[in-house]
Amino acid sequence: MAAHLSRRALTGAMTGLILAGCASQGPQHPAARTSPPPHLRSRGASDAPSLRPASADLSAPVAFSYTDSDDETSDCIFYAAGDAPVGLVVYLDGDGHPFHNQGGQSSAERSGGGLAGDGGVVEAAGARGYDVVSVRSPGDEGIWWVDDQDGKVRYLEEALDYVAVECGANTERVWLVGYSGGSEFISQWFFPAYAERMAGGGFILFGGGDAPEEEGAAAFSGDAKERLSLNWVTGTRDVPGNSVDRFDGFGHARNSLNYYRAAGFRHTWSEWPDDDHDSITEQFGRYVGRVLDDAASEK
């Protein structure tokens, strides 16, 4: 059996994304916030969305930089579903951001599945009325799960506030979708910090995840445990024997699932297909669509 490419070694040069403003439109609905939070208002954010892709070409993503209140800067790519989004899918890529970096490519150049390829996250989410934003990890290393986790949690929280205010995203339902290192960051650090702010949605983790490292991280409210849906999809062949750096995506995913079930979350689901760390990326859209459909049917 051929060994995997190392997920830690993925680097991928950043594709030349054109930083573009979004065309100004009429009132967006529904907006999760009626006014910007203080950290945005103090920097001149308006009450009405000033950014959103023109509805004439929703297939064209919009790339922009965001700098947080601690002067950390990174880039985001926003894919609009339409003028009345039902929620927001937040995608965090693996090490080197191989799929995030394809945002500036034509559809023919993108690999299948992943974030924005055929059968990918954007296709599945957009078909169900969800905007999608992919956020690159701040910091020179470009990896979500290493260094200054508190700073990265703050950065992502503020970036999502910015997307809600300036792009008119609806954050009443937020789905955190991660791959590999992005899944680790969501399950270990971001979700424990952000869950109480999520009115609906949950997370979908591909190719890994893990249990939070800090004791006491399971201080979730009973309401959060009832309203949020937590989902794991990792291949049974995503194991150390298939990875040049001995990464155990399957083991990490199961650790994460066991932790959140023990913490008392009532809506957990997992599937372990016959895939490895690479081939699972071709299934992203299929599983994202399935989770979103199941959540819609339970409302």
What do these predicted ranges mean?
Residues 126-151:
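Cap/lid segment of the alpha/beta-hydrolase catalytic domain
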Residues 145-167:
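Alpha/beta-hydrolase active-site loop
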